[in-house]
């Protein structure tokens, strides 16, 4: 009986996701703000030209937004009073680019006051971050509204880098995302960097023994040694490491090549090799011969994720500034 209730709940959640995402439209602003994509892209070209490493964080920010309360811009809200917002929760304390999101939103507000949501601005920025990193381009369905609530404790819905395969599949399924979405969106790790503390448990404390021999046995030894040379202790809270060594500013197939060799940075990356479907996908694209196929898959999964639990119509609001409600 309990399992039946769980299945019913998942089906109802999936139906709600599909209903809300169906209300999004690539041409939503064609009359009210036809220049919105050009305005966003102009700011993105300028910013990534000066700091190309910002692409990964912006993509990650959109992902973190969508997995908590849906793609409603709640990750952008500041904490207020006694209420701690998502951005100040532990999983989000390493997010960066909030100031740049505000700059882009200000440019959009200047062009079209009170028209385009922060959630839509962030979705467009994530798309352009990928495209300007030599990744795929896709049409972004628009029409999201901004949420008014942001709760730090709800960030437990975010898949942690330590997650095993069962945890990953459950967290993705809760957002109506399947195994293909899991392996495809994980490959967003082809751009960007990570702090050592997100993975040093694999190097020094995998089973809780906290000694030099307590390593993740699924991690390739030479790669492990290289990571140890950069992250010298569990207490390293500042060092940044490339997630896709050598091409962390380029959106390519490098992620799959690394994971196939057991050189995925996070434990969650390595877990993709424990399932037949995701392992086959990794191995197929590790060969480097199907870039267009992966790009199309990534675009499709980003559109699907971008429709998770969105607010539309008269729900929510259109924030004037992304860090505070109106």
UniProtKB/Swiss-Prot annotation:
Its EC number is 1.11.1.7. Heme b binds at residue 189. The active site is at residue 64. GO terms for cellular component: extracellular region; plant-type cell wall. The keyword Transferase does not apply. The record marks 60 as: Transition state stabilizer. Ca(2+) 2 binds at residues 190, 244, 247, 252. Residues 1-22 form the signal peptide. It catalyses: 2 a phenolic donor + H2O2 = 2 a phenolic radical donor + 2 H2O. InterPro entries: Haem_peroxidase (IPR002016), Haem_peroxidase_sf (IPR010255), Peroxidase_pln (IPR000823), Peroxidases_AS (IPR019794), Peroxidases_heam-ligand_BS (IPR019793), Secretory_peroxidase (IPR033905). Keywords: Calcium, Disulfide bond, Glycoprotein, Heme, Hydrogen peroxide, Iron, Metal-binding, Oxidoreductase, Peroxidase, Pyrrolidone carboxylic acid, Secreted, Signal. Glycans are attached at residues 82, 153, 164, 205, 237. It comes from the Eukaryota. This is Peroxidase 1. It comes from Oryza sativa subsp. japonica (Rice).
């Amino acid at each position: 009986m309990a399992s039946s209730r769980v299945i019913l709940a998942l089906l109802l959640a999936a139906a709600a996701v599909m209903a809300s995402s169906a209300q999004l439209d690539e041409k939503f602003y064609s009359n009210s703000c036809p220049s919105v994509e050009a305005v966003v892209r102009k700011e993105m070209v300028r910013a990534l030209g000066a700091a190309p490493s910002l692409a990964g964080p912006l993509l990650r920010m959109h992902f973190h937004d969508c997995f908590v309360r849906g793609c409603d811009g709640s990750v952008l809200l500041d904490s207020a009073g006694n209420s701690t917002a998502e951005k100040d929760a532990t999983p989000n304390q390493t997010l960066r680019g909030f100031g740049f999101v505000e700059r882009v939103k200000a440019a959009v507000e200047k062009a079209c006051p009170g028209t385009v949501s922060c959630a839509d601005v962030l979705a467009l920025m994530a798309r352009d971050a990928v495209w300007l990193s030599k990744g795929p381009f896709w049409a972004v369905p628009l029409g999201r509204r901004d949420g008014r609530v942001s709760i730090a404790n709800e960030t437990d819905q975010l898949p942690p880098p330590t997650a095993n395969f069962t945890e990953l599949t459950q967290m993705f399924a809760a957002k109506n995302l399947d195994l293909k979405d899991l392996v495809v969106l994980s490959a967003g790790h082809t751009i960007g960097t990570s702090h050592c503390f997100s993975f040093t448990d694999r190097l020094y404390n995998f089973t809780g023994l906290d000694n030099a021999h307590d390593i993740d046995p699924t991690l390739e030894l030479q790669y492990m040694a290289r990571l140890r040379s950069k992250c010298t202790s569990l207490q390293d809270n500042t060092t940044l490491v490339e997630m896709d060594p050598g091409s962390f500013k380029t959106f390519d197939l490098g992620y799959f090549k690394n994971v196939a060799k057991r050189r995925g940075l996070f434990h969650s990356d390595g877990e993709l090799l424990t399932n037949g479907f995701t392992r086959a996908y990794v191995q197929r694209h590790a060969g480097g011969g199907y870039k267009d196929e992966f790009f199309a898959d990534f675009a499709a999964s980003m559109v699907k994720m971008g429709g998770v639990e969105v607010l539309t119509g008269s729900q929510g609001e259109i924030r004037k500034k992304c860090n505070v409600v109106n």
